[in-house]
Amino acid sequence: MKFLKLIPILFIFFGNVPYKNEVHAEIKNPEDFRVLSNEIKKLSISNVEYFIKEGDNYIKNGDFEKAKEFYLDARKLAKQLASFYSDLNSSFKGIDARIPKEMQRKGKETLQILAEVNERLASMYIKTEKPEVAVPLLVETIRIMSPNSPEGKEAYERLIQLGFVETKYKG
């Protein structure tokens, strides 16, 4: 019976003995380990900006379908990022004030770029005579940026031009 009590002690003792074939990970630059902080970021605002830039290039060349694909990719990624930042902001409230501040800053930046993508998509849909598809994008811009922001005011003005709303906003 006493022998059974010694077994955990033996495991602890022999478990801490270094092994001959032990391999240690070596990282010369700690920043290389942070995959999403590198230049080639898939899940980042810079990637959203890349999609927008590519869409703009296709608009200049008159290829609206390709531009739409890039703008929709930018919009999808921006919405994902905004959702992730919002979730992290909520999760850390009351625990560590630094993290919600960072997430709020990044979230605002993401919503700003989402409004930019929505504006470009709405313009493209209006130009290709599909204003019914532009309306939800303009309404979303007003919702995420507020009617008092320059983006919100511009989106509401576009809704007036489309005939979706009639009352002028004096804000």
Question: What are the functions of these language-model segments?
Answer:
Residues 46, 106-113, 151:
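Structural signature of alpha-solenoid helical repeat junctions
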Residues 69-99, 140-157:
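Short, charge-rich amphipathic alpha-helical segments embedded
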Residues 27-28, 92-109, 160-171:
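Alpha-helical linker/edge segments of TPR/alpha-solenoid repeat scaffolds
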